[in-house]
Design a protein with these regions (language model features):
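Glycine- and small/polar-enriched repetitive beta-structure motifs of secreted/surface proteins
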Residues: 1-176
Length: 176
């Protein structure tokens, strides 16, 4: 069944929260469901589940024609008229990974795919989970050392995006 949404601040146009608790949302076209203690400042973020996420920035969108339904009810709640119509609106190109927790996404079109990940800068994606071995320049390979110095104990901090079979382009940044 539905869990009531409680203790939320939702401001802006077209923002919705379903079964959410203690979220703060400001912007346009955001849609959160099943989330707890998330902060979203930006536009067109869609996220299902998760908790303790901080999102600052807007997602990339595209214009799409979507079908909606207008429903008129009488005082008793009985449907007396239902009419389908189409409208063109901005929709996000993608949704965030479901059930992500403790993530930080700062910048336009950023995303985190693993719990605890951090994505900083436009189009950055944090996709590497904890447990990944760091690169050892002395061997030109991932380190075999399993200490916390070489093996991550938390998800990655990303300032770019690696190319994957389903994505277009690599994004790199210089850290100075």
């Amino acid at each position: 069944g539905n869990t009531p949404s409680i203790n939320n601040t939702i401001n802006g146009y077209g923002n919705t929260g379903t079964n959410v608790e203690r979220i703060s949302m400001m912007g346009t076209g955001n849609n959160m469901s099943g989330s707890t203690a998330d902060v979203v400042i930006g536009d067109y973020h869609h996220m299902d589940g998760g908790k303790n996420n901080v999102i600052l920035g807007s997602m990339a969108t595209e214009k799409k024609t979507v079908e909606k339904t207008y429903t008129m009810k009488d005082a008793s709640g009985n449907v007396i008229l239902e009419k389908k119509y189409k409208v063109t609106e901005n929709v996000p190109i993608k949704s965030h990974t479901a059930n992500i927790s403790n993530a930080v996404m700062l910048g336009y079109n950023t995303d985190v795919e693993k719990d605890g990940g951090v994505a900083i800068g436009a189009d950055s994606v944090a996709s590497v989970d904890k447990g990944a071995a760091g690169y050892d320049p002395s061997t030109d390979m991932a380190s075999a050392d399993t200490s916390a110095t070489w093996k991550a104990t938390a998800a990655a901090v990303s300032v770019g995006k690696a190319a994957t079979p389903t994505s277009v382009g690599t994004i790199t940044r210089q850290i100075t």
